[in-house]
């Protein structure tokens, strides 16, 4: 019976999300950026673009062409 508890605990640890990797939040922010006609930039927006939001918790920026 102890082996079942140990296996369950190990399975739980491996399936737990990594801290700082907000998978669902990142996906929603990325989708919202695409809906607003933007793109996700890794470092920053290009000179002819403006920042309209963020694409992830880690700091990617959502950019689109200036109007």
Swiss-Prot record:
Spell out where the chain crosses the membrane. Answer: none
Keywords from the UniProt entry:
Antibiotic, Antimicrobial, Defensin, Disulfide bond, Secreted, Signal
Ion transport as UniProt keyword: no
Gene3D superfamilies for the chain: Antimicrobial Peptide, Beta-defensin 2, Chain A
GO CC annotations? extracellular space
Q: Which residues form the signal peptide?
A: 1-22
| Family the UniProt entry places it in | Belongs to the beta-defensin family.
Protein's name according to its UniProt entry: Beta-defensin 103A
Species name? Equus caballus (Horse)
Q: What lineage does UniProt assign to this protein's organism?
A: Eukaryota, Metazoa, Chordata, Craniata, Vertebrata
């Amino acid at each position: 019976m102890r082996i079942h508890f140990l296996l369950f605990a190990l399975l739980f640890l491996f399936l737990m999300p990594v801290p700082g990797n907000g998978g669902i939040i990142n996906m929603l922010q990325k989708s919202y950026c695409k809906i607003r006609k933007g793109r996700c930039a890794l470092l920053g927006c290009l000179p002819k673009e403006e920042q309209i939001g963020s694409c992830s918790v880690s700091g990617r920026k959502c950019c689109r062409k200036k109007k």
